[in-house]
């Protein structure tokens, strides 16, 4: 079993009098792939922001890649973390080309300036873009891409700095069925890659959980309903308590989950 990548101890987050997270105890190890699932407003994105050193807890302690938040240079720490999120996509300069968007992740910046990239950086960026099925888009502007293409390019960017931790905030949100299935399949391949970093994926749809994910946390109103190995956590009872409605849960032969009301 690998070393510890994330550790939350009694973590709470409050903003404007509202409790966004309540007493979260959680740890992620190097060889684990976690999905965080729950309804809208459950605290999933807040949890990911804390894990990505983008937000400090109001109470409790957080260790990210062996560094304690509040006692570390977070700008340096963030270079060791890959992040793909809608908030990041909104900050991309409209004329940014796909190749440049991926390359600039080496410096944890957006927008090409005067920085220099060697042949190794360019080769890695091209390989990642190709791995995510976007080789034909390499010279396109990010603003001209479809939603599915943007999601895949964001993941290539998140992987560019060879991160020790990969955070994916609702990567399949806004995709049609074909786009979602293509992305989930690619993420499943990444999850099963022994060389891939530790992963934490946020979603509120169980059908978006890629095969190969090993652990799950179910969140409701900022509190953990259940967490641990995915086979023990993903039950109809746990899912029904998380979403507040009776749900049946099925799993296909390829390891994918599907929920339906009953």
PLM feature segments, named:
Residues 52:
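Helix-to-loop junction immediately C-terminal to a conserved catalytic motif
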Residues 103, 118-137:
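Conserved ABC ATPase "signature" region
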Residues 166-170:
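Catalytic Walker B motif of ABC-type/P-loop ATPase nucleotide-binding domains
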